[in-house]
Swiss-Prot record:
Protein name, UniProt field: EF-hand domain-containing protein D2 homolog
Residues bound to Ca(2+) 2: D118, D120, D122, K124, E129
A Pfam family recorded for this sequence: AIF-1
Start-end of Basic and acidic residues biased regions: 191-204
Domain of life, per lineage: Eukaryota
Limits of the EF-hand domain: 69-104, 105-140
GO MF: calcium ion binding; calcium ion sensor activity
Organism, as annotated: Drosophila melanogaster (Fruit fly)
Region (Disordered): 1-29, 191-217
Residues that span the membrane, as ranges: none
Keyword Repeat carried by entry: yes
Length: 217
């Protein structure tokens, strides 16, 4: 394995960051890739089983709400950031992904993102767990300002094509649209609540009138 060839491969990736930040990020990412691959090789040499890319699951049947094309797109995105090629996104890979999406997270924020979908508590995100992010987003189970929600929304566009600013504009437009929708629903609920109060008041006035009328009968 050649470090120079890996470095060349890493530098060929399109970048949406500034030259200086990209150099630092790529260098850190390359170091992480090499360290992770070294860990895998040492484990295999020591006779320790290394968990491979996929569990025995069928994501197409486990996630019927997504079409095959959607799942293939999610797989492509997952593979892009699974730089160690071990079938998981660890904290460093997730950090790199969020930076590329233009939504960098704190260390604690990244750990919280992983914990929210980490079914087997291994501290990493498998592809199945990655799909859980989009299931939760589709079901409205993610906080609008959470890291996972940002990940789900930002991956709806191709950041490599539109750039970080374009993706952020898309995400902000989505948020604004949702806020408008929520405001509309709030207004409807307020009107319904007002009508309910008016009906209760009318019913109460009728009852009071009937009670007073009964006194004079």
């Amino acid at each position: 394995m050649s470090v120079s060839s890996n470095a060349s491969s890493a530098s060929n990736k399109d970048s949406v960051d500034s030259p200086s930040s990209t150099t630092n990020t790529d260098s850190s990412e390359l170091t992480h890739i090499l360290n992770r691959r070294q860990e895998i090789m040492e484990s295999q040499e020591a006779g320790i089983e290394v968990r491979r890319t996929y569990k025995v699951v069928n994501v197409y049947t486990d996630f019927p709400e997504f079409s095959r094309n959607q799942i293939k797109d999610y797989q492509k995105t997952f593979n892009t950031y699974d730089t160690a090629r071990d079938g998981f996104l660890d904290l460093q890979e997730l950090k790199f992904m969020m930076e590329k999406l233009g939504a960098p997270q704190t260390h604690l924020g990244l750990k919280q993102m992983i914990a929210e979908v980490d079914e087997d508590n291994d501290g990493k995100i498998s592809f199945r767990e990655f799909l859980l992010i989009f299931r939760k987003a589709q079901a409205g189970e993610l906080d609008s300002d959470s890291g996972l929600n940002q990940l789900a929304r930002l991956t709806e566009v191709d950041v490599e094509q539109v750039g970080v600013s374009g993706a952020k504009n898309f995400f902000e437009a989505k948020i604004e649209q949702q806020l408008r929708t929520n405001k509309f629903h709030d207004e409807i609920r307020a009107e319904q609540e007002e009508r309910r109060r008016e009906e209760e008041e009318r019913a109460q006035r009728r009852q009071q009138f009937q009670q007073r009328a009964a006194i004079f009968q």
